[in-house]
Swiss-Prot record:
Signal peptide from the UniProt entry: 1-19
Induction comment: Expression is under the control of transcription factor XYR1 and highly induced during wheat infection and by xylan.
Keyword Phosphoprotein: no
Organism: Gibberella zeae (strain ATCC MYA-4620 / CBS 123657 / FGSC 9075 / NRRL 31084 / PH-1)
The protein, known as: Endo-1,4-beta-xylanase B
Length: 228
């Protein structure tokens, strides 16, 4: 059963602390210039799954596609921002199953991660995280009780930030952050999308949607498998 709770008042939105747009292959030569690195992802299809990987510090991370929906990411040195994972393009309201080993040391997320267009929105359904809870730095919009836990619904705004539509765009980030952390389970994305809509957070046309591991100026390792 899904239950919703919404707030009638909230604090001002702030820029999300960890936001990475369309995720860069670390075994390629790093491009010149930070902006180019930030807007040049590696994407494709691997074993029937869409994948996306992005980093602004190629020397600090290794991303590997495995069999089926499996992928792994190792990052170190407490440097840079890295996001990688597998899923689908386009995204949709689907139930996503996942399992694996997620071991962050510092600021990191394990999340269903995606984008929409018209409006341009970056979204996270955070299943696990390291030392920083992203809902603590965003405007609280409500709660959803589903899949054995309460998720905090929040929104933040990015100004002149890299996105799937260019390197200097203003857009909102939608968040559902699970209170009872886990590294395996299933995510009913449609329930989260409906909860966001009832909280006034509208999505557009789906671009890609992946189970992602993100690390920001931290270290860690993860091997995950996604299916749907």
């Amino acid at each position: 059963m899904v239950s919703f709770t919404y707030l009638l008042a909230a604090v001002s939105a702030v820029t999300g602390a960890v936001a990475a747009p369309n995720p860069t292959k670390v075994d390629a030569q790093p491009p010149s210039g930070l902006l180019e690195k930030r807007t040049s992802p590696t994407t494709g299809v691997n074993n029937g799954f869409y994948f996306s990987f992005w980093t602004d510090t190629p020397s600090a991370v290794t991303y590997t596609n495995g069999n089926g929906g499996q992928f792994s990411m190792n990052w170190n040195g407490n440097r840079g921002n890295h996001v990688g994972g597998k899923g689908w393009n386009p995204g949709a309201a689907r139930t996503i199953k996942y399992s694996g080993d997620y071991r962050p040391n510092g600021n990191s997320y394990l999340a269903v991660y995606g984008w929409t267009r018209n409006p341009l929105v970056e979204y996270y359904i955070v299943e696990n995280f390291g030392t920083y809870n992203p809902s603590s730095g965003a405007q609280k919009k409500g709660e959803i009780n589903i899949d054995g836990s309460i998720y905090d619904i929040a929104v933040s705004t990015r100004n002149c930030a890299p996105s799937i539509e260019g390197d200097c765009k203003t857009f909102q980030q939608y968040w559902s952050v699970r209170r009872n952390k886990r590294s395996s389970g299933s995510v009913n994305t449609g329930a989260h999308f409906n909860a966001w809509a009832q909280a006034g957070l509208r999505l557009g046309s789906h671009d890609y949607q992946i189970l992602a591991v993100e690390g920001y100026q931290s270290s860690g390792q993860a091997t995950m498998t996604v299916s749907g």
